[in-house]
Amino acid sequence: MAAAVLRSSRVLTNILRRSGATLAGVQERSDRGYADMAFTFASPSTVFYKAAANVKQVDVPSFSGSFGILPNHVPILAVLRPGVITVHEADGNNKKYFVSSGSITVNDDSSVQILAEEACTLDQLDSQAIREGAAKAAQDLLSASSDFAKAEASIALECYDALQRAVDHP
């Protein structure tokens, strides 16, 4: 099955090669380097990256699944779920941040914007405070008397679970 999918994905390439044609923009974009991704990442209180050109890849958690972004990524708009964003810099450094929620926009010009509701570096997280918060959120969920209170407690618990995973598996 996988072989059939792989063969079918090459059909367009083979047709274009035989006819001497190319996809518009493919050659132009293939010459671009990692420095061509302009990356901005901010929360209401902190700007982590502002149109940074030293980023070669960003890995993000979204409600439609986790995915990596490289230069020339297809344009996309996604909603962030609680989790870890990993920024791979051109010099080989990887920086990790926890985000509670937010949005990510990838534009056709390889610019990427992440706007987080809340964000911090992983070293700012306190394991004990996370465990206490998770216990309180679980108790709030059990004692919630309205749908709104249940939803609020459920969201808090989901965020604390993601925080705990970030601390346990950086």
Pin down the residues of each PLM region.
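Compact, glycine-rich, soluble single-domain proteins
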Residues: 40-132, 136
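Generic hydrophobic segment detector
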Residues: 3, 11, 71-80, 149-154, ...
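Acidic/glycine-rich phosphate/pyrophosphate-binding loops and surrounding catalytic core
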Residues: 120-170
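N-terminal mitochondrial targeting presequence
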Residues: 1-36
